[in-house]
Amino acid sequence: MSKIEHNSAKTIDGGAAALHKTVVMVGMMGAGKTAVGRALAQRLGVPFLDSDAEIESAANMSIPEIFERDGEAFFRDRESRVIARLLEGAPCVLSTGGGAFLAEANRRMISEHGVSVWLKADLTVLWNRVRHKDTRPLLRTADPRATLRALYEARVPLYSEADLCVISDGETSIEQMVDRVIAALATRKDVLELS
């Protein structure tokens, strides 16, 4: 992982940007992977893909329905297959589900074909973003906040293996988060060239 936790902004300032590898957004549910990823793709002029949306489209059902009908293990297998397929294409921005980066095979595949960017948010920020949503199957428990805390504590060590880390503090706009991600990516000339 980048030794710097990127929380300063740098913009493209009208210059051209050349993306050489797929940017894979990783992190907890509620970290902003989809919102920031979509805005980043627009700023860089590359496609935005969402692994969860691709899975839902292929299965013709929602993630919670897949979890309920087929279980988490089935979902994780499909998730790995979809990510592998999406990484084969031209460089883009790919948002992944919160659990995708947990599998060692997925981390290796992402490292070989892209660059992982961990949107690091603290537990309070995450809870404030997800507590009113019923689309998170892993939080359908008697104590969803305790469940989120347990997931957070288990996942952070794996997320810390990401190539780059960008702080998502809950007070920064999506556009400012995109600036932070671009600043982090710009430290990797094999990933992003700014001119």
Swiss-Prot record:
Mg(2+) binds at residue 34. Signal peptide: none annotated. GO terms for biological process: amino acid biosynthetic process; aromatic amino acid family biosynthetic process; chorismate biosynthetic process. Substrate binds at residues 52, 76, 98, 155. ATP binds at residues 30-35, 136. GO terms for molecular function: ATP binding; magnesium ion binding; shikimate kinase activity. PROSITE patterns: SHIKIMATE_KINASE. Binds 1 Mg(2+) ion per subunit. Keywords: Amino-acid biosynthesis, Aromatic amino acid biosynthesis, ATP-binding, Cytoplasm, Kinase, Magnesium, Metal-binding, Nucleotide-binding, Transferase. Pathway: Metabolic intermediate biosynthesis; chorismate biosynthesis; chorismate from D-erythrose 4-phosphate and phosphoenolpyruvate: step 5/7. The keyword Hydrolase does not apply. The keyword Metal-binding applies. Monomer. Belongs to the shikimate kinase family. This is Shikimate kinase.
